[in-house]
Amino acid sequence: MNKNIKYSQNFLTSEKVLNQIIKQLNLKETDTVYEIGTGKGHLTTKLAKISKQVTSIELDSHLFNLSSEKLKLNIRVTLIHQDILQFQFPNKQRYKIVGSIPYHLSTQIIKKVVFESHASDIYLIVEEGFYKRTLDIHRTLGLLLHTQVSIQQLLKLPAECFHPKPKVNSVLIKLTRHTTDVPDKYWKLYTYFVSKWVNREYRQLFTKNQFHQAMKHAKVNNLSTITYEQVLSIFNSYLLFNGRK
């Protein structure tokens, strides 16, 4: 692999695996797709065959030039040479996002596509352990993401599917946007609440009596088995106790 390639990327080259991924994406001929990381253009080419338009964002200069040459005659593909973390997704246009993201930037990128885009569906190839962390409502990331999207695994991708072979397995996941569980006017309060909640700084949020009432109202018997819905209930109690509702 070229030494200048950014973010230590691992590439999917197997036609069989690429086709399996495409089948899971549920894209239509009318769909506009934003792809994170053009890479060598293998997935980009297949995306363009089943969608209306693909805008693919690639930071690495070597890969951008390589894919530009490969895809220059494909009228359905637009390539952009930019860092995805600096890219601005459109506000009004309907679109979906697809991407295989660098493992060590997973948190930054998933926050970017969930909180700074209006994509209805987001398909990401991520490290398997990271996927599990997105579901963990005892972590900040899980509690933030769940307010905007539902997350599900679509496909397991063993390390052998990639070149060079990584040390971990990956999965294809789908994030489906739903109506937000936390209105914009309460978002800053929610992020503050979450920061204290995951660190078990309950006294920063409630008096002893308030905490007992909030837990009772949410029907929480054991904090270790608490659900996302129960955390939301406790947050609503926090708002009420602070005169925000």
Swiss-Prot record:
It is an enzyme of class 2 (transferase). S-adenosyl-L-methionine binds at residues 10, 12, 37, 58, 83, 100. GO terms for molecular function: 23S rRNA (adenine(2085)-N(6))-dimethyltransferase activity; RNA binding; rRNA (adenine-N6,N6-)-dimethyltransferase activity. One of its GO terms (biological process) is response to antibiotic. It catalyses: adenosine(2085) in 23S rRNA + 2 S-adenosyl-L-methionine = N(6)-dimethyladenosine(2085) in 23S rRNA + 2 S-adenosyl-L-homocysteine + 2 H(+). Its EC number is 2.1.1.184. One of its GO terms (cellular component) is cytosol. Keywords: Antibiotic resistance, Methyltransferase, RNA-binding, S-adenosyl-L-methionine, Transferase, Transposable element. Belongs to the class I-like SAM-binding methyltransferase superfamily. rRNA adenine N(6)-methyltransferase family. PANTHER family: DIMETHYLADENOSINE TRANSFERASE (PTHR11727), DIMETHYLADENOSINE TRANSFERASE-RELATED (PTHR11727:SF7). This protein produces a dimethylation of the adenine residue at position 2085 in 23S rRNA, resulting in reduced affinity between ribosomes and macrolide-lincosamide-streptogramin B antibiotics. NCBIfam families: Erm23S_rRNA_broad (NF000499), erm_B_23S_MT (NF012220). This is rRNA adenine N-6-methyltransferase.
